[in-house]
Amino acid sequence: MNVDEEIQKLEEEIHRLGSRQTDGSYKVTFGVLFNDDRCANIFEALVGTLRAAKKRKIVAFEGELLLQGVHDKVEITLRPTPPPPQAAAATAASS
């Protein structure tokens, strides 16, 4: 699995384990992700996948490196997905 595939899987798992916020984002704590059996089986290096997703501005969390136990309560936010360009153009045209 390459980095893009791992980030896509991470998004799916945050949707599954997290809670939807009013702005369309999803939040989950690092501890919930790290201790989930399904995530443990999918991600060989969860922290590395999180860092790659943060670098691409797909997720946000405080700090650079998350460690089990120490950072279990750190919230990870999956940013809302912007609408596809066609939908955005249609919305702008109807305004």
Curated annotation (Swiss-Prot):
Positions carrying N-acetylmethionine: 1
Organism domain of life: Eukaryota
Transmembrane helix is among the record's keywords: no
Keywords: Acetylation
Pfam families (alphabetical): Costars (PF14705)
GO CC, one annotated term: cytosol
PANTHER family named in the record: COSTARS FAMILY PROTEIN ABRACL, COSTARS FAMILY PROTEIN-LIKE
UniProt family annotation: Belongs to the costars family.
Name used for this protein in its record: Costars family protein At4g33640
